[in-house]
């Protein structure tokens, strides 16, 4: 390790280009990973925020909440389960505007009611308000409505379909579902809006959400239970998008490592005479291997840390229109994978070093 470090200090110009390349490639991989997570969060953030809950749906919904309907009979059957506390949830895409004549804004209503336990509270911004505190025709909006549209607490927004005015009472953090910002309303508010276009409408939750660990065998044959991950995977477009972007991220990581392997190989060719001298003075191949791998590890580690740090520092300055979300788990996985694959690709040059003949190289007839 000491020999590897001393060589890097003695001839830094040889390693600066490779170091810069590692920093750039690592930055690209981490940045793309952040965008992948950010796009995923714009689809599933609120379901993720709710945590490890169980969702009771009708079997014909195929696990998609907006396609499900819980009937009064279903509700009575669920109530018979011992210790069953739940919250009802319905999800509805809609549009709102600040005034009758202003531009329409996409919104997804999360309409809720509660049995005993209130478990569908969003992450609130600057308030302890809960969903159960909502009065009729009040709404809690995602904070992006404030940041992007200038809407403030106390303002009103107009539901474009029912023409109902909703008073903004608070904002929630990262409240998104299906590429849309969320507006949290009570079941009474939702029922009132629906009855303006359909007077016969009666509130029916699309899903019953509970902390209780249950299975589909505990329910009637026309009901099923899913967990958070299954609900998120069933959001239209989420799974295909997420798998595609993650595949691109890992392909970029492998391609980056291969590029680094080529640079390490070129660097090895430039040092063949040096390796010949080392062999001539008695250094074994295992010792040379240790020096090379130590050098690869040092270079990769420094580059990865700097690239990761650069991407992390840049993330807070990205505009809201660029969804980026970095996690410690992903950053660690990428960093370890990047270092290991870089060392593996760079280690291929050891085959060339092993073939070095000290007599030929020192005599000037080597490659």
Predicted regions and their residues:
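N-terminal Sec/SRP start-transfer signal
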Residues: 1-29, 293, 366-367
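Alpha-helical transmembrane segments
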Residues: 14, 27-54
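Membrane-proximal extracellular/periplasmic loop immediately following the first transmembrane helix
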Residues: 45-96, 106-112
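The feature marks short, hydrophobic/small-residue-biased sequence motifs that occur predominantly
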Residues: 73, 88-133, 184
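Small-residue transmembrane helix packing/gating motifs
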Residues: 88-92, 167-212
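Mid-to-C-terminal secondary-structure elements
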Residues: 143-183
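Peri-transmembrane interface segments
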Residues: 217-273, 277-278, 289-293, 297
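Short helix-loop junctions at transmembrane helix boundaries
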Residues: 290-291, 297-364
